[in-house]
From Swiss-Prot:
Residues in GIY-YIG domain copies: 26-105
Naturally occurring in which organism (per UniProt): Chlorobium phaeobacteroides (strain DSM 266 / SMG 266 / 2430)
Domain UVR intervals: 219-254
Protein family (similarity comment): Belongs to the UvrC family.
One GO cellular component term: excinuclease repair complex
Gene of this entry: uvrC
Protein name: UvrABC system protein C
General function of this protein: The UvrABC repair system catalyzes the recognition and processing of DNA lesions. UvrC both incises the 5' and 3' sides of the lesion. The N-terminal half is responsible for the 3' incision and the C-terminal half is responsible for the 5' incision.
Amino acid sequence: MDSNPLHHSNPPVGSLPLDKVASLPSSPGVYQFKNAQGRVIYIGKAKNLRNRVRSYFRNPQQLFGKTLVMVGKIADIEVIITSSEVEALILENNLIKELKPRYNVNLKDDKTYPYLVITNEPFPRILVTRQVKKDGSTWFGPYTEARQLRSILDFIGSIFPIRSCKLRLSPENISRGKFKVCLDYHIHKCKGPCEGLLTEEEYLLMIVEITRLLKGKTSATIRSLNERMLSFAKELKFEQAAELKTQIDSLKRYAERQKVVTSDTLDRDVFAVASRNDDGCGVVFKIREGKLLGSERLYMNNTEGVSVQDLLARVVERYYLETCNLLPDEIFLQTELPAEEKETLENLLISKISAEGKQKRTIRLTVPIIGEKAHLIQLCRENARHHLEEYLIQKQKRGEALREHSGLIALAELLHLPKTPNRIECFDNSHFHGTDYVSSMVAFVHGKAKKSDYRKFKLKTVQGSDDYAAMHEVLTRRYSGTLSVELPLPDLIVVDGGKGQLSTAVKVLVSLKLDIPVIGLAKRIEEIFTPHTSDPFNLPKTSPALKLIQQLRDEAHRFAVTYHRKLRTERTLETELTTIQGIGEKTAQKLLRHFGSVDLIRTAGVDELRAAAGNKTAALLYRFYHPLEEG
């Protein structure tokens, strides 16, 4: 067995038999990781189940964060083979919704969002519902913005006199005069199809125009209505022509209010995401005919440690799984999707186009770099950040989220950290002329000490007074092996020391393939060192960030010194006991653990000593400390 404490051992991979991984099929499908209690902790999809699952176990030392912890808990795996990647995507989405596994990114369930439906019946109605049924109706949504949905409905109602009643308007019922017109007819909100005052053919013409409008085809709707208006005028049907003229004017005003965002008239969806700690928000801009039709947003949790690419893939896939109609010509993305996710999305879009019975076409996936298109991405990202901030504020008001520590926010800004450092770990060393060398690690979570996560290290490889070697050992032991699984990885590491200590820390993290921000804090003058700058800098004395770092450093120093003094005292006491002939080091340690101090051993009676160490040792001790009582 390798006794070297600096050996970079692989993280544990749970109790999953690896021969089970080797026997998995190479088919597309869904895999479920289970823990020792049989609970599903992660669900994923794959084009090739064996290759995807094997990737978790092939190089476990390259894993980090939540993935590393998850792999350490895998005890079993269950797979479901599907006929295609798209089928696997649909199944994965449904299973995640149902089971809500601990390590999956969870999007807010779309069953809470409303859809707009044009019913499949004579004289169709336009309704708002939260349940999608495959009954031949035409569906639009989901709408995450309730205000946007109300605005659309009000606008449609102001232009097109569509019925709002629940009557069964079959030709037989109408011809028998079964119904009478309601108030909507008298206030010009309905044309009275219930009494046969409007034919079904005329009514369906309005439905066609409404469908175009909901798809963002405002120009096509205006052209169609204009043609009909001119036709009525030629036939001297001036009342009908005037009615259409009013509708056209309203549509033109509506179109003018829509912001033009691209110089061409292509239909596009634009996606961006933002995340902070364990929450995220995805935003999609719906652009039709070059105009911004509206936006939707999807909120996520359990996002900590998940890459932007994976979050974006989750949002885009979920959006097109749930969205009815409105498929664009092109999709703009904040960043490239992982290759397999991109292929799955392309296949999903093809299947949706086929299911709608439309002509086969390719929807392009693009990451704009320059110009007005890149500006759209930037605008979408800013919206995602803004909505996420509002979402977090609301969570705080509801008591669902901790209010962020001002020092943490200041640290994130000053150090340009990728996220708020909600977990910070600080390391310090202590020794006396190279003896009793110890290190301490303290953890602050949400700006407060979490003493259950403190760790102390009795160093094993350091020779003499070598603080760099001490820092190398303690960081290696903390971030490799079982400790790396026991404790979550921090968002920031602080080492007590200057450039040399910081350089040592960076080397250790690089060797362990860990991407964790790290800084050094020099003693006394409070200078902060960062890896990519040669000169240190000072924080203002009033900065909450400086106050927090000082608390961390002082706590790590206190913890290290306390442990060092304890070891040194024990060693001194052990030396006194081991001068007694017949008392070895192990016996001395055992006695100190039992009594707590040499003074208590010195004053103990024979029976107490006998109970702790046996007859022979008790006699030796009593004779040593009570020589005058002999004879």
